UniProtKB/Swiss-Prot annotation:
Residue positions of motif 'HIGH' region: 43-53
Motif ('KMSKS' region): 551-555
Catalyzed reactions per annotation: tRNA(Val) + L-valine + ATP = L-valyl-tRNA(Val) + AMP + diphosphate
EC number(s) per entry: 6.1.1.9
Matches recorded under InterPro entries: aa-tRNA-synth_I_CS (IPR001412), aa-tRNA-synth_Ia (IPR002300), Anticodon_Ia_Val (IPR033705), M/V/L/I-tRNA-synth_anticd-bd (IPR013155), Rossmann-like_a/b/a_fold (IPR014729), tRNA-bd_arm (IPR010978), tRNAsynth_Ia_anticodon-bd (IPR009080), Val-tRNA_synth_C_sf (IPR037118)
CC annotations in GO: cytosol
Keyword Nucleotide-binding among UniProt keywords: yes
Lineage: Bacteria, Pseudomonadati, Pseudomonadota, Gammaproteobacteria, Lysobacterales
The keyword RNA-binding appears for this protein: no
Protein name: Valine--tRNA ligase
Entries under PROSITE patterns matching the protein: AA_TRNA_LIGASE_I
Length: 942
């Protein structure tokens, strides 16, 4: 065994350790013990590891490692998603960058798909390499790609079964259409935001010389206008769509227009007659109370059109240009050019009544940012009502638990208001819909293959069949992930991959932002297709934001690559990474300036363990999680402290050969074993409740404060004392507790704990070859009658802390011997002083410990109190009192000036000052006040 390095350098061992673990097969399911399964939300094959991935994967890996150490048969199912739209966009962009003139359309379907597979082979394993660097302990031999043959067969099977159940149907419906991608997208892929626009009012002439009496009143009901009109005024935010109007509508109880219901108006610019219909949908109080109806280009109008059996006129091509259904002079115009042309003609005709500014909700595609067009087209849909009813039952009856439970309300609302799911996409990359059309008759046949279709429907070779060109949206295959990865529907593959053993999985860890995209659909699909729940628990994580609470995004230039935190990156490389390939080049200078200010020296290497521990510590149950680099630096220091504590232990146990649990001889040993039992119990509780933040906190407190700061200190008197038995027992306990601590920390910080454990294991006679297969500590391992020792040592710690604080306040040199005088106190204090006198003298550098007699006056001294016991450190000979008074007076004056500056700053802050800046100054003021109070207290003692 090589000697432990003198300094903590994670780069020197992390990669080697991972390779050794993987080579030894430690990540594969054992096949014995209770199964514990986690599904990795499959990252897009287009992607690289980002902080969201690192966050969730760290928590998943901690759970997998924890349960593996507890003897569970662990399976972490990993893989990647083909990501239809995202991948087509990336490959199309790469083709353009290559400059060979090749495009998606010029290559054709087969040629383009070939290019996608080439690109997938080149870049598809990048994210898996990055996951390994983070420490992901997954069985990579089972890694699955959603376009692999097995999951592709599952997709076809699911489609056919749902079609045969009547759940899948094909129909002409209004969908969200992205004119850049030229495909339908789901409601969940549409982002609506308020934007500035206009509301145009247009006159529609009544047919057959009809007229009505138009009356206007002010807010008080006073009549301001009365006239006879032969036209209706209709307001719209999209005047170009009037070319596709098939009705105007009024409220059935609106007396103003009652006699016009069933009559007609002449559609401007077209001369077409369209009916005046009545529908409760109309808001009589808005505008004139007359609404145009364009069923093919508005979702609400579509429902009206269905209710009234109105014609549906599709005005647009797939790229949102006007088609042959528009008057010839408008055909071929882009929708916005058409808007200008329509408005110009309306104005020339004198029927553009009014134009006014208007705020409106504009829907845009989340990938392209383009305005989405409601578009009438043939698509494939899944009927969701019955699936959703059952999916909601499984959560509400407790079959599946949500953590935190408040997400049930969000889930319930969506499931109760669910719409049929449009599953077809007009793309090439993806699972092609298993449906074939008879070229001659147009008849549609669904089956697992063309051969099956021909056999089932007795179609000879003379019948020409063409497969549906559309592919299924990515989430259709993703919803099958819990069981397609376990071999379904192939019975042999299901047996080989442990379908019955590993389904349902134990927990799904995912972001709340895909509760509808993925979580709900997995619940519904798994229940319907295999009669099981997909998972027992769902733990929803918050979204990772930067230190200021901003969403991390490429456009903001605030993205942190987890590998840069692990391995470090220079400032120039970081700037290049953040500014390269920006969609808005004007942001480059701003992003570079902000980056150089935040990271003037780049990002130092922190190692995987420090990042993982940071993530665990930040994993609260809130919606948003601010990633703070200072926390990462702090946990790197934590790893360094653990390293140095291990070096101390190893140096003091050279040649040791212990077995089993030590028989503690000192109170310090009994105390640390008692604390070890408590923290082991607490840690298991936090794992059970998915409280990774509290887990990290309790382990940090035990490792840093109780083991490193206190037990190592309290062990020194025994290690350096005359009692050989005490020294030997303490050495055994040092090794034993450190080994248990490494086991406690291992799921969160696997690399450093394994590296240190390899040094300790031989000295404890342990048979295992790796820490990852050691049992996770339980309180029962360390049980003993330690209550009195724990109370005694807590008292000892309080005394040591109090005297050290006095020494520090008096600026007494650490090496200087001082006397300690004791006054008052209880009988128990006297017993404890006697018991711990050697430890106190050793640790506090005391040259004497004396009790003052009852009634004896105390010498001039700095005092501290622990319970009823007064601790006195005589001042004579320790400090130059006059010089110390002068020093403290100067320091008090300096801090008072800084305090006043801070108060003045806060008083002058306005509402325009960022809240983070205000909070930072408030923290400074608190710090100045704390310093000032401490200095004044010291001055009073002199």
């Amino acid at each position: 065994m090589t000697q432990l390095a003198s300094s903590y350098d994670p780069k020197s061992f992390e990669t080697d350790l991972y390779e050794a673990w993987e080579k030894a097969g430690h990540f594969k399911p054992s096949g014995t013990g209770e199964p514990y399964t986690i599904l990795l939300p499959p990252p897009n094959v287009t992607g690289t590891l980002h902080m969201g991935h690192a966050f969730q994967q760290t928590l998943m890996d901690a759970l997998v490692r924890y349960h593996r150490m507890r003897g569970y048969d662990t399976l972490w199912q990993v893989g990647t998603d083909h990501a239809g739209i995202a991948t087509e966009m990336v490959v199309s962009r790469n083709l353009a960058l290559e400059g060979k003139g090749e495009t998606r359309d010029s290559l054709g379907r087969e040629g383009f798909i070939g290019k996608v597979w080439e690109w997938k082979q080149q870049s598809g394993d990048i994210i898996e390499r990055q996951m390994r660097r983070l420490g992901t302990s997954a069985d990579w031999s089972r890694s699955t790609f959603t376009m692999d043959p097995q999951p592709s067969a599952a997709v076809n099977e699911a489609f056919v079964r749902w079609y045969e159940q009547g759940l899948i149907y094909r129909g002409q419906r209004l969908v969200n259409w992205d004119p850049v991608l030229k495909t339908a997208i789901s409601d969940l892929e549409v982002e609506s935001a308020e934007e500035d626009g206009f509301l145009w009012s247009i006159a529609y002439t009544l047919d057959d010389g009809l007229s009505y009496e138009h009356v206007e009143r002010d807010a008080d009901g006073v009549e301001t206008l009365r006239e006879t009109r032969d036209y209706l005024v209709v307001a719209t935010t999209r005047p170009e769509t009037l070319l596709g109007d098939t009705a105007v509508m009024v409220h059935p109880e609106d007396a103003r227009y009652a006699h016009l219901i069933g009559k007609s108006v002449v559609l401007p610019l077209t001369g077409r007659r369209v009916p005046v219909i009545a529908d409760d949908y109309v808001d009589r109080a808005f505008g004139t109370g007359v609404v145009k109806v364009t069923p093919a280009h508005d979702f609400n109008d579509y429902e009206v059109g269905v209710r009234h059996s109105l014609p549906m006129i599709n005005l647009f091509t797939p790229v949102a240009a006007l088609n042959e259904n528009a008057p010839e002079r408008f055909q071929g115009l882009d929708r916005y050019a058409a808007r200008k042309a329509v408005l110009a003609e309306l104005e020339d005709l004198g029927i553009l009544v009014e134009t006014k500014a208007h705020k409106l909700q504009v829907p845009r595609g989340d990938r392209t940012g383009q305005v989405i067009e409601p578009y009438l087209t043939d698509q494939w849909f899944v009927k969701m009502d019955d699936l959703a009813k059952r999916g909601l039952e499984l959560v509400e009856d407790g079959s599946i638990s949500f953590v935190p439970p408040n997400w049930i309300n969000t889930y319930r609302h969506w499931m109760n208001n669910i719409q049929d799911w449009c599953i077809s996409r007009q793309l090439w990359w993806g699972h092609r819909i298993p449906a074939w059309f008879d070229e001659a008759t147009g008849s549609c046949y669904v089956g697992r293959s063309e051969e099956e279709v021909r056999a089932k429907h007795s179609l000879g070779s003379d019948v020409v069949l063409n497969q549906e060109s559309d592919v299924l949206e990515t989430w259709f295959s993703s919803q099958l992930w819990p069981f397609s990865t376990l071999g379904w529907p192939n019975e042999q593959a299901m047996a080989e991959r442990g379908f019955d053993r590993y389904l349902p999985s134990s927990v799904l860890i995912t972001g709340f932002d895909i509760i509808f995209f993925w979580v709900a659909r997995m619940i519904m699909a798994t229940d319907n297709l295999v009669g099981k729940i997909p998972f027992k628990d769902v733990y929803f994580t918050g979204l990772i934001r930067d230190g200021q609470g901003q969403k991390m995004s490429k456009s903001k230039g605030n993205v942190l690559d987890p590998l840069d935190i692990i391995d470090g990156i220079s400032i120039d490389d970081l700037v290049a990474k953040r500014t390269g390939g920006l969609m808005q080049p004007k942001m480059v200078e701003k992003i570079e300036k902000a980056t150089r200010k935040e990271f003037p020296d780049g990002i130092a290497a922190h190692g995987a363990d420090a990042l993982r521990f940071t993530i665990a510590a930040l994993a609260t149950h809130g919606r948003d999680i601010k990633f703070d680099m200072n926390r990462a630096e702090g946990y790197k220091n934590f790893c360094n402290k653990l390293w140095n504590a291990s070096r101390f232990t190893l140096m003091n146990t050279e040649g040791a050969a212990f077995t089993g649990m030590p028989t503690p001889r000192t109170d310090a040993e009994r105390w640390i074993l008692s604390r070890l039992a408590a923290v082991s119990s607490e840690a298991q509780g936090h794992y059970a409740n998915y409280r990774f933040d509290l887990l990290a906190q309790c382990l940090y407190e035990f490792a840093w404060n109780e083991f490193c700061d206190w037990f190592l200190e309290l062990s020194k008197p025994a290690l350096n004392g005359a009692d050989a038995a005490d020294a030997e027992s303490t050495r055994h306990t040092l090794l034993y507790v450190l080994e248990a601590l490494l086991r406690l920390l291992h799921p969160l910080t696997p690399f450093i704990t394994e590296q240190l454990w390899q040094q300790l294991a031989p000295r404890l006679g342990l048979a295992e070859t790796t820490l990852s297969l050691r049992p996770y500590p339980t309180a029962a391992e360390f049980e003993g009658d330690f209550a009195q020792a724990e109370a005694d040592v807590e008292w000892l710690k309080a005394v040591i802390s109090a005297v050290r604080r006095v020494r520090s306040e008096l600026n007494v040199a650490p090496s200087k011997q001082v006397p300690l005088r004791l006054q008052a106190g209880l009988e128990q204090d006297r017993v404890r002083i006697e018991r711990f006198s050697a430890s106190l003298s050793f640790l506090l550098k005391l040259d004497s410990i004396q009790w003052l007699a009852e009634g004896e006056s105390a010498p001039p001294a700095a005092a501290a109190i622990v319970g009823e016991l007064k601790l006195l450190v005589p001042l004579e000979g320790l400090v130059d009192l006059d010089a110390e008074r002068v020093r403290l007076d100067k320091e008090i004056a300096r801090v008072e000036v800084e305090k006043e500056k801070s108060e003045t700053k806060l008083a002058k802050f306005t509402d325009k000052v960022p809240p983070a800046v205000v909070e930072q100054e408030r923290v400074r003021l608190v710090d100045w006040n704390t310093q000032l109070a401490g200095l004044r207290e010291q001055r009073a003692k002199l």
